[in-house]
């Protein structure tokens, strides 16, 4: 799935279901089946161990292009490349790291870097990023979000 298609999935779904933890593939398939049944077809696994890669691959194999399946908490280029090689449709990071952004965009995959300032947001946008993660939104608050955008 290319970056434009993945972005369209995210826009149309309106929700990206985040799956944090060391989900074994069978549990990830059970959770994603419930979500798919409710019309949620975008899933973000969190890269906090090796288990999320296997879970992501299982969900991707089960649903193919009927779901948009990606990985969050990607912190460096080496991890981004491993996740991309495993078939991620998108990557999200809690930080704006230009080297990670370049590596992901070079493979025409949707990238959502974390941004906390207008300068980071504009820099990411000028690099070709079309999905931004305002992070940490909980600490910054909705008023900060409104003022920024």
Which positions does each model-derived feature cover?
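Short acidic active-site motifs
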Residues: 55, 78-79, 99-100, 119-121, ...
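Conserved N-terminal beta1-alpha1 strand-loop-helix module at the mouth
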Residues: 1-86, 106
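Short acidic/polar active-site loop segments enriched in Thr and Asp
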Residues: 41, 89, 130
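Canonical helix-turn-helix DNA-binding module
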Residues: 51, 91-92
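Active-site/ligand-binding-proximal alpha/beta "capping" segment
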Residues: 98-99, 106, 126-149
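Glycine-rich beta-to-alpha transition loops that act as phosphate-gripper elements at the mouths
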Residues: 19-24, 71-77, 93-97, 113-118, ...
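Alpha/beta catalytic cores of nucleotide-metabolism and tRNA/nucleoside-modifying enzymes
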Residues: 1, 116-130
